[in-house]
Amino acid sequence: LAAALTEEMGWNVVVSNMAGGAGAVAFEDVLSNPDDGYRFVFYHSGAAITQIMGMYESFNVLDDFKLAGMPVLDYSNAFVSNTANEKFSDVETMVAYMKANPGDVTFATETGSFTHLHVLAFQEAAGVEFHIVDAGTASQKTTELLGKRLDVIGTQAGLVRDYLDTKEFTCLGILADERLAGRPEIPTMKEQGYDIVFSKFFYLAAPNAADDAVITAMNAGL
């Protein structure tokens, strides 16, 4: 997105990756800097879930920011395992194993995040119980899964595409109505008997005090 805005609009768009707190670090950074509208937070709709769960204490994502635009709609939310995992190989065998061994399968999420909601929904639909672990950011979860210190992570299929290509990771299911056009080999949870569908949009937002002219320009660029 930054590269496209730089090319199309002639702007110098600098990306600063701020991990932690299910987006809290990034939101707080934007709020603590000058409200001239030149600093945006790029995040997704899962922030509303985190807000409702009471994980954001120093700000409110719904009241303290204004949207500049929503450039991405994502349908690739997924459950992913390490292919070398010996407990199960797909959703069917995972559920069977979990029913025989309640709480033995670890699921990595970030407390209060969108993936936290995903795992709770799956547990209810399948009648099983994970051992839910707060393993931090998407990259941290991926590292732990690669090291076989976790059984399943909630992430986006695109974020682990390299490991899917090398067969090191297995995508157990996409939380969407239909299979992904770019990954038609991955089944949906819905077709496997679990009607769990979650999509999310990514957006750019700035503090309420930001210059409206800058917000309008960003919206036009998007």
What does each model-identified segment do?
Residues 3-14:
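Signal peptide-proximal N-terminal region
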Residues 5, 29-38, 52-140, 201-222:
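Hinge/capping helix and adjacent helix->loop/strand transition within the periplasmic-binding protein
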Residues 11, 33-43, 102-105, 128, ...:
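Alpha-to-beta junction loops
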Residues 18-19, 43-44, 82, 110, ...:
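Active-site-proximal beta-strand/loop segments in catalytic clefts of secreted hydrolases
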Residues 18-26, 73, 111, 133-143, ...:
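Short helix-initiation/N-cap motifs at beta->coil->alpha
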Residues 21-24, 37-50, 70-74, 153-163:
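Ligand-binding clamshell of periplasmic/extracellular solute-binding protein-like
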Residues 46-58, 116-125, 151-185:
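A ligand-binding cleft/hinge motif common to bilobed small-molecule-binding domains
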Residues 160-222:
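C-terminal lobe and pocket-closing loops
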